[in-house]
Amino acid sequence: MKKNTDSEMDQRLGYKFLVPDPKAGVFYRPLHFQYVSYSNFILHRLHEILTVKRPLLSFKNNTERIMIEISNVKVTPPDYSPIIASIKGKSYDALATFTVNIFKEVMTKEGISITKISSYEGKDSHLIKIPLLIGYGNKNPLDTAKYLVPNVIGGVFINKQSVEKVGINLVEKITTWPKFRVVKPNSFTFSFSSVSPPNVLPTRYRHYKISLDISQLEASNISSTKTFITVNIVLLSQYLSRVSLEFIRRSLSYDMPPEVVYLVNAIIDSAKRLTESITDFNIDTYINDLVEAEHIKQKSQLTINEFKYEMLHNFLPHMNYTPDQLKGFYMISLLRKFLYCIYHTSRYPDRDSMVCHRILTYGKYFETLAHDELENYIGNIRNDIMNNHKNRGTYAVNIHVLTTPGLNHAFSSLLSGKFKKSDGSYRTHPHYSWMQNISIPRSVGFYPDQVKISKMFSVRKYHPSQYLYFCSSDVPERGPQVGLVSQLSVLSSITNILTSEYLDLEKKICEYIRSYYKDDISYFETGFPITIENALVASLNPNMICDFVTDFRRRKRMGFFGNLEVGITLVRDHMNEIRINIGAGRLVRPFLVVDNGELMMDVCPELESRLDDMTFSDIQKEFPHVIEMVDIEQFTFSNVCESVQKFRMMSKDERKQYDLCDFPAEFRDGYVASSLVGINHNSGPRAILGCAQAKQAISCLSSDIRNKIDNGIHLMYPERPIVISKALETSKIAANCFGQHVTIALMSYKGINQEDGIIIKKQFIQRGGLDIVTAKKHQVEIPLENFNNKERDRSNAYSKLESNGLVRLNAFLESGDAMARNISSRTLEDDFARDNQISFDVSEKYTDMYKSRVERVQVELTDKVKVRVLTMKERRPILGDKFTTRTSQKGTVAYIADETELPYDENGITPDVIINSTSIFSRKTISMLIEVILTAAYSAKPYNNKGENRPVCFPSSNETSIDTYMQFAKQCYEHSNPKLSDEELSDKIFCEKILYDPETDKPYASKVFFGPIYYLRLRHLTQDKATVRCRGKKTKLIRQANEGRKRGGGIKFGEMERDCLIAHGAANTITEVLKDSEEDYQDVYVCENCGDIAAQIKGINTCLRCSKLNLSPLLTKIDTTHVSKVFLTQMNARGVKVKLDFERRPPSFYKPLDKVDLKPSFLA
């Protein structure tokens, strides 16, 4: 539709990122980061975690030790493909095996002697079963074959029930920036976490808190529960860094506002007063005394030297191999941020900012669980050895303990929605459609439980840090997840890195930093600290920071470090720090590079001519300075121009202020929002509603629908959308379809299509329009003896069963039909009975309102008979079914009209769907009209000038004016029919037609908007929701209809329903519904003296209250409802007396009637 001009080079570069890049191993861009994350875990990280050699127990001053060694870790892929697994109803797991050796080391004069205690060579087929992530095209990390099946989505797990599941990515609780908090006026805390690098196993966590109270500056302490002493932060920094207090004062005061300098002087002076209050103060003695006091307080079994080494050596685990002096300087840099944040809180990243968080991807979930369960496994072995030694006097391990690592249970819980016992839920979803299985693995969410508990969270508001990296439209509009779940934009991904790559990258960066002159990277007093993953490595001369960052970024883009996703952030604003991030879990996306006021895209004239033949990785190699991968922290502290158009309108001096430039607006949407059209032309809420509805749209048939026993609703005759965006095409959503093209008319039809009501043509339905097939899984478990029992009396429920007790293939199940034999029998203890065996049917029945055909039946025989039945049903649109356009113009079928009842145009064409025209004005969905215009224009000219079929590009968010699209439609019509008059051309462009009344065959007075559009059928189907019934089961307590459509439940007749009938004055109806039915009728006797309901004792009605007082009151029989009696009984049980009183009226007397004389009048 558009020409590839220089002004649209940014759009073409953005498209290059979305398409597959086989040279870089990217076959499916939307979920590539999930595939890499999981493959890193199962191919590398699992081996690193399970390979262990460490002491379990030590005796006699470490001269005797019980050791455990786990080795020979092997991961074996399954013998079959994911398709076969789903057909069989099996889980799709890889098998991990290892060897465990437990031995005793004794240190002797001759050396170390080793005595074997126990060993286990894990060859059990169920030792560790790891659910495999199935990638696009049924790929998995252990299968080198890459066969791509167009309609097989990736990013799912298959669990035992053969339900493919996907889950969102949770935000880690640990923040990379310390969390600032105002405890009370003039009292603040600064808490941070320190986590050991990935090469240190098991992972060590430490959580520290710096407290500061303006009224007690001497108590400005750092503390950590049971892992560190409580000590003055200034004195600890002095102890570690070995510098004077004046050095610390100058370091904290450098480049700080006057108010912060005043607080710095006060803190340093308070630390001086603290030292002066102690006679002959020595910093080493002071720290040693605190360590000894903590040793006594904790009652540690370690010696004082071991305790001190353990505490100080493990201080700041993320700087594990760093000298204490650098740890001291790191604490000074933290204190700088803390003091600055007290006065300028708004300039510091808050705890809800995505700058502070890393994100857990699928591989990280399994990695975390493997860590935790391995520690539990080793702990169980240790406890078992101690118990055996205590009870039997031998070092032995039960084989049961060795063969149950516990990982299987943890992994199965993960797919059920439970991540860790102490953490929030991991939201999982069944596999239904293409849209869901792209959007959910790309969703990022906070722990709902954590947000509920903590009062500090404000994440429910759209946080500024989410801009550009998250889709602003695809967010939950209701429910507990509002504001907690966000969708990544199409350009965003999450970083992954192997441990070996991490160490090599860290080494290269450190070598680069140390290549600078030694004095320039040792400005620890007034320089800019350089940190790699929060670990301090140097402090740079302030005069060199700009050159350092610019050179580092250039080298990064050129591949000098071997990783293009390294993040380097220059934090100015008095906090003065250069942060280099290389870890996993960071949000990254590409940006256009601006260098010295020039957009580097414009400096490369060869780029435009070669772009069509290049992949994204080719651009990064051959034109490295055009695009840079930037993480969210670097983006937040950089100057980024909103668009190329705005950048080019600026002056030269203004351009030099920018570091990066963004891509067009369409790349800020997620993949779900990209399936919509022109959301920037509509009102804001339409975008949010449109995303929610698009995920509910029924898509085309997925693989093996007739074989695998799984739930699903599938479109039978799908069509590829004509009006699409590039993201919709590259993600394969367009190719796999989620709707059909229908002809619509915007008009009123006899007042039937009011509000959301739509009219749909009967012949359109009969021809398969928006026809779907429902696949439904029914699963029952039957005790073996019940399944083998024979029925004594013929039951209609068993009419569809074969002689083997299973439902017949191709049988049509109706409501009440059994799917398998389940007969319970009981023996009567009656010696005189001729047949003391009774049996009754307890089978689960088919409960759906519609008939379904049996497609597949599976049986598993164990202690129980597990029967799984797959039923299929073609379901055409009926009254009440829900539909929508891609602009959130939802509609419900209000009337199915025959073709003869519908208006027609001059060619006799009638609309398939009639939509209320006022909905366009009330919902302001202009882009719906544009979509109809572009779809109609495509029908006039479906091929480009080269004779190739080309869809129309109408991105979800675009900066193209409506006039441009009108001009495109005009050119299409002029090309196909150049002889059109201006009026005819205008009518065709704007899809205006004269329709004729079917009753009079006369044209309507005004033209009607009439044209094709892509229409979606939603999952909300009438027959799946209908629960109204006239007769059926009732609950025993309240005798109302039981709940749940699956259990054959109905709608309760409650207060609101009663009030509606009262409003209409339908007294007899209320009496009939609430009282006169057989089940609800209840006779009770009421005491006229106290108002209690009489009790029945030995068949005699007695008022208990009055009988104790030796009274003999009158009992009156009344008829009431059972619910009323239950209510009164429950109120009495809670100590509330409800008295039933009778209305007492005085007797009425009438005057005597006048006498009537019956004599004939002539006698009178």
From Swiss-Prot:
It comes from the Viruses. It holds the Pfam family RNA_pol_Rpb2_7. It is found in: Virion. Its EC number is 2.7.7.6. It is an enzyme of class 2 (transferase). It catalyses: RNA(n) + a ribonucleoside 5'-triphosphate = RNA(n+1) + diphosphate. The keyword Transcription regulation does not apply. GO terms for biological process: DNA-templated transcription. The keyword Phosphoprotein does not apply. InterPro entries: DNA-dir_RNA_pol_su2 (IPR015712), DNA-dir_RNAP_su2_dom (IPR007120), DNA-dir_RNAP_su2_hyb_sf (IPR037033), RNA_pol_132_poxvirus (IPR024390), RNA_pol_bsu_CS (IPR007121), RNA_pol_Rpb2_3 (IPR007645), RNA_pol_Rpb2_5 (IPR007647), RNA_pol_Rpb2_7 (IPR007641). Keywords: DNA-directed RNA polymerase, Metal-binding, Nucleotidyltransferase, Transcription, Transferase, Virion. GO terms for cellular component: DNA-directed RNA polymerase complex; virion component. Its main location: virion. Belongs to the RNA polymerase beta chain family. Part of the DNA-dependent RNA polymerase which catalyzes the transcription of viral DNA into RNA using the four ribonucleoside triphosphates as substrates. Responsible for the transcription of early, intermediate and late genes. DNA-dependent RNA polymerase associates with the early transcription factor (ETF), itself composed of D6 and A7, thereby allowing the early genes transcription. Late transcription, and probably also intermediate transcription, require newly synthesized RNA polymerase. The DNA-dependent RNA polymerase used for intermediate and late genes expression consists of eight subunits (147) kDa, (133) kDa, (35) kDa, (30) kDa, (22) kDa, (19) kDa, (18) kDa and (7) kDa totalling more than 500 kDa in mass. The same holoenzyme, with the addition of the transcription-specificity factor RAP94, is used for early gene expression. This is DNA-directed RNA polymerase 132 kDa polypeptide. It comes from Cowpox virus (strain Brighton Red). The gene is RPO132.
